[in-house]
Amino acid sequence: MAADLAGKWILESSENFDDYMKAVGVGMVMRKMANAATPTQEIKIDGDSWSIKTSTTFKTTDISFTIGQEFDETTGDGRKIKTTCKIDGNAMIQDQKGSPDSILSREVKDGKMHMILKVNDVVCTRIYKRVD
């Protein structure tokens, strides 16, 4: 269930992240820094109210939102977008409207958080392990 996402997570593996960042327009210098980072995500859930704090050694971003309600989001790379989140089965889906549109999903499978990032025909998979 989506509530299993609550907690603190650290990146364990990443596939196709550089291609995803290129597809959303991230410049080379920022891509190099992001590829070298090992982010943590701290997810808090209170009913339909969620917050996600993503931290690296060079940047921290916080988003707070209510499931089903559109909100303004500034992404880690500085893009300003409109986002709506929803629950789909055991996953929390972020539908990001900007230039370009993208979809991020988070779901716990086998005790790990699987984060799938999609833009156009590019798919990135990032696996996080729970931090005790």
Curated annotation (Swiss-Prot):
GO terms for cellular component: cytoplasm; membrane. It is found in: Cytoplasm; Membrane. Expressed in the optic nerve (at protein level). It comes from the Eukaryota. Changing residue 20 to F: Does not affect activation of Na(+)/Ca(2+) exchanger and ReP1-NCXSQ phosphorylation. Phosphorylated. Phosphorylation may result in the release of the bound fatty acid. It holds the Pfam family Lipocalin. The keyword Phosphoprotein applies. (9Z)-hexadecenoate binds at residues 126, 128. One of its GO terms (molecular function) is lipid binding. Disulfide bonds: none annotated. It is a peripheral membrane protein. The keyword Transport applies. SUPFAM superfamilies: Lipocalins. Keywords: Cytoplasm, Lipid-binding, Membrane, Phosphoprotein, Transport. Changing residue 128 to F: Loss of binding to fatty acid. Fails to activate Na(+)/Ca(2+) exchanger. Does not affect ReP1-NCXSQ phosphorylation. Fails to activate Na(+)/Ca(2+) exchanger and does not affect ReP1-NCXSQ phosphorylation. Binds and may transport fatty acids such as palmitoleate. Also binds poly-phosphoinositides including phosphatidylinositol 4-phosphate (PtdIns(4)P), phosphatidylinositol 4,5-bisphosphate (PtdIns(4,5)P2) and phosphatidylinositol 3,4,5-trisphosphate (PtdIns(3,4,5)P3), and phosphatidic acid. When phosphorylated, stimulates the activity of optic nerve Na(+)/Ca(2+) exchanger. Interacts with Na(+)/Ca(2+) exchanger NCXSQ1; ReP1-NCXSQ phosphorylation does not affect the interaction. Belongs to the calycin superfamily. Fatty-acid binding protein (FABP) family. Forms a beta-barrel structure that accommodates hydrophobic ligands in its interior. This is Sodium/calcium exchanger regulatory protein 1.
